[in-house]
């Protein structure tokens, strides 16, 4: 990462307020014009890629505070992409401390339409072995201490979340994995991701409970991330990298940090290849996702009842349907 940072150009986005009549809104000033249609959230190892060119570091502020870190923006296969270290460089944020709203808002600022979440997970099923890759299609939310919406404070919205993963983006990931024929890696192209609070790993009783619910993998980060991405009208899919069998399997050791890191390092190059191939697919065949219009009918509060301060915070999300009054 040191070499990338030394080569990076710094771009700072400053948010200032203007009042176009009915409400205030945020505008960006004095910033490098960055538009990256594809975003990747994961570990810092993901953007240490030889294929990543024209790299710059973009520091953003948001109405929801600072993101986990600066965004690393560059070109993969000629396409602008934005990477973000979910836990910050140096992995200094607990899962419960991740500024999920700021991270997703930052991706929205950068013009991201497709967001890939690369995540370490434990397996809850024997067939999903360590080093395998899972592309889930469902979530179970077991988090307790996290704000899971941009809305509130006078503006009410209810997004549809029955199918929480964008099926087209998930298919791109699955096709990329299958086409690479990675040695020792089996693709599981559907499954249920159980998102727990952490930071402690599961008890045996909890692990077996999640298995009885049909859980495929377990992790600590994809919720509320996926919900917020849907509210921001960003297509979202998960590349789940299996590192362990949690603690339920009688023939395997219980999960440890050492085990997780060891298997993640083994899978880092594979994950980079999958991301590169997925970016190529998206560049060749961009698509409109149901996520891209998730807010169209989701807001219940009449626009003339929007509190000015709340609209100001949400203008990047709401402006498409509720532009500021002239």
Swiss-Prot record:
Pfam families reported for this sequence: PNP_UDP_1
List the catalytic activities from the record.
S-methyl-5'-thioadenosine + phosphate = 5-(methylsulfanyl)-alpha-D-ribose 1-phosphate + adenine
Record has Metal-binding as a keyword: no
Q: Which InterPro entries match?
A: MTAP, Nucleoside_phosphorylase_d, Nucleoside_phosphorylase_sf
Residues that bind substrate = 220, 244-246
What's this protein's name? S-methyl-5'-thioadenosine phosphorylase
Q: What is the lineage of its organism?
A: Bacteria, Bacillati, Cyanobacteriota, Cyanophyceae, Synechococcales
The protein's UniProt keywords, in alphabetical order, are:
Glycosyltransferase, Purine salvage, Transferase
- Positions with a binding annotation for phosphate: 44, 86-87, 119-120, 221
Q: Indicate the annotated site residue(s) for Important for substrate specificity.
A: 202, 257
- Pathway the protein contributes to: Amino-acid biosynthesis; L-methionine biosynthesis via salvage pathway; S-methyl-5-thio-alpha-D-ribose 1-phosphate from S-methyl-5'-thioadenosine (phosphorylase route): step 1/1
Query: GO CC annotations?
Result: cytosol
